[in-house]
Swiss-Prot record:
Protein name: Endophilin-B1
Stated family: Belongs to the endophilin family.
UniProt keywords, alphabetically: Acetylation, Apoptosis, Autophagy, Coiled coil, Cytoplasm, Cytoplasmic vesicle, Golgi apparatus, Lipid-binding, Membrane, Mitochondrion, Mitochondrion outer membrane, Phosphoprotein, SH3 domain
Signal peptide feature range: none
SH3 domain segment(s): 305-365
InterPro entries according to UniProt: AH/BAR_dom_sf, BAR_dom, Endophilin_SH3RF, SH3-like_dom_sf, SH3_domain, SH3GLB1_BAR, SH3GLB_SH3
Gene name linked to the record: SH3GLB1
Residues modified to Phosphothreonine: T145
Amino acid sequence: MNIMDFNVKKLAADAGTFLSRAVQFTEEKLGQAEKTELDAHLENLLSKAECTKIWTEKIMKQTEVLLQPNPNARIEEFVYEKLDRKAPSRINNPELLGQYMIDAGTEFGPGTAYGNALIKCGETQKRIGTADRELIQTSALNFLTPLRNFIEGDYKTIAKERKLLQNKRLDLDAAKTRLKKAKAAETRNSSEQELRITQSEFDRQAEITRLLLEGISSTHAHHLRCLNDFVEAQMTYYAQCYQYMLDLQKQLGSFPSNYLSNNNQTSVTPVPSVLPNAIGSSAMASTSGLVITSPSNLSDLKECSGSRKARVLYDYDAANSTELSLLADEVITVFSVVGMDSDWLMGERGNQKGKVPITYLELLN
């Protein structure tokens, strides 16, 4: 029975306190009651904490998007994290592309130029996928986790104490209001006693909140170290990817390098197939100062390297008079020409000469 009485009294006291705070808050909003202002230093600390929370959330969320662009995958990882379970490993985009390239190259034939190149590209893409996975793991551990710990831990504590400070401030101002309205000596003495208690509780809560807020500077220093770790992880990732692509470029250049023009050279703009075949001797196609004469003068083009035999892999129908039609399994002579697009070679069969796509050829010697 005594316990029940205590609970009822406590409930009544809590309800009275809540009502008192609500009345004080409403009167302040209506300009009918005075409001105790926090000191400037504490206000600055509160603003700094709020600003830190807002930008930390934005940086954290956008970093998650950067590392995992797939929103469904992010939701799945979030659910597994809340269930305290490890998310199942999933193949990432570079790894999937790499596997497709390897499968395609195997089907086209590793002995063909295109098939060989696809397999090499696929292996490199899979290595990039592994590096991507390592970047995500390292960044999540060294960068995202500390940011999330601040949002879900430190800042929640700050917000809780800030709310308590707000309540203590309302209690203090309500006590001041009651003291002003007190007329009888007994009521005034009681109000003065209440004011001293609420003032003490407010000062104590303000000090607790201030100490917590001053830790924001340490949070910034910690997040700076985490940011350095993130930058280092990105630097390692991009350096790995650059090295992988550099090695791949060397491998791809090893078998057709003598017949591919420099990719940095200006490409020739192909003549559209809709143009008439009969082009005057004065007609020319030019890009950036590079001039290629009409098809009738193709034989006058200067070869930039020796000729070489190539076997045709597939039938090819010329799109216009500058190109040479091909039949599968026939052997033609090919050579490169200064300024020609890297995807093309000059082909020669008897008295016929024209551009041929390199992907349709297998170099023989």
